[in-house]
UniProtKB/Swiss-Prot annotation:
Keywords: Cytoplasm, Endonuclease, Hydrolase, Manganese, Metal-binding, Nuclease
Subcellular location(s) of the protein: Cytoplasm
CDD domains: RNase_HII_bacteria_HII_like (cd07182)
Family per similarity comment: Belongs to the RNase HII family.
Protein's UniProt name: Ribonuclease HII
Residue stretches making up the RNase H type-2 domain: 1-187
Claim: Nuclease is one of the keywords in the record: yes
Keyword flag Hydrolase: yes
């Protein structure tokens, strides 16, 4: 059975896209060290990212931008991204395994697996692709807006990030539907 593993990164941050990734692994090319991306060092994630994109049978990465997140809400934006991942790889898999407890509204043979990124290697691989891709976007945001410190906090609502929004203002990359950003917009 050919498995498509799907996971996302970036539901909690105040800025940047939510990213979903899907991976179909090549059973003949073993990638050692696959695990939940949150449990790996940045260096290990980068190394595994390169191995995954080189050796996977297929993969895709989808971004939903902050404006769409604001229009849909983060759950619907995440489900939309996951749906697009499956559509991008349609007819290449027998079953979809998604990290978490919710599935998009689709007709694919699928299962949501809580903590799937720690249990299923295809989901672990997707977790790594989504996290590294999103972190790279945050590094680009840091180059564009160095005063905000995106390389450090990756868009999460840290004290530093909130202080920098207050000091320098809300950017287009911020999610305006998120309460901390709304509060700062209304000050």
């Amino acid at each position: 059975m050919i498995i498509l593993g799907i996971d996302e990164a970036g539901r909690g941050p105040l800025s940047g896209p939510v990213v979903a990734a899907g991976v179909i692994l090549d059973q003949d090319k073993i990638i050692d060290g696959l695990a939940d991306s949150k449990k790996l060092t940045e260096k290990k994630r980068q190394s595994l990212y390169q191995q995954i994109i080189t050796h996977a049978k297929a993969y895709t990465i989808v971004e939903i931008n902050p404006q769409q997140i604001d229009e849909l809400n983060i759950l619907q934006a995440t489900l939309k991204a996951m749906h697009q991942v499956a559509n991008n790889l349609e007819r290449q898999f027998d079953k979809v395994l998604v990290d978490g407890n919710k599935l998009p509204n689709w007709d694919y043979n699928s299962e949501a697996i809580v903590k799937g990124d720690s249990k299923i290697i295809e989901i672990s691989a997707a977790s790594i692709l989504a996290k590294v891709h999103r972190d790279n976007i945050c590094l680009e945001h840091d180059r564009l807006y160095p005063q905000y410190g995106f390389a450090k906090h990756k868009g999460y609502p840290t004290k530093e990030h909130l202080e920098n929004i207050k000091k320098y203002g809300v950017l287009d990359i911020h999610r305006k539907s998120y309460k901390p950003v709304q509060v700062l917009l209304n000050e």
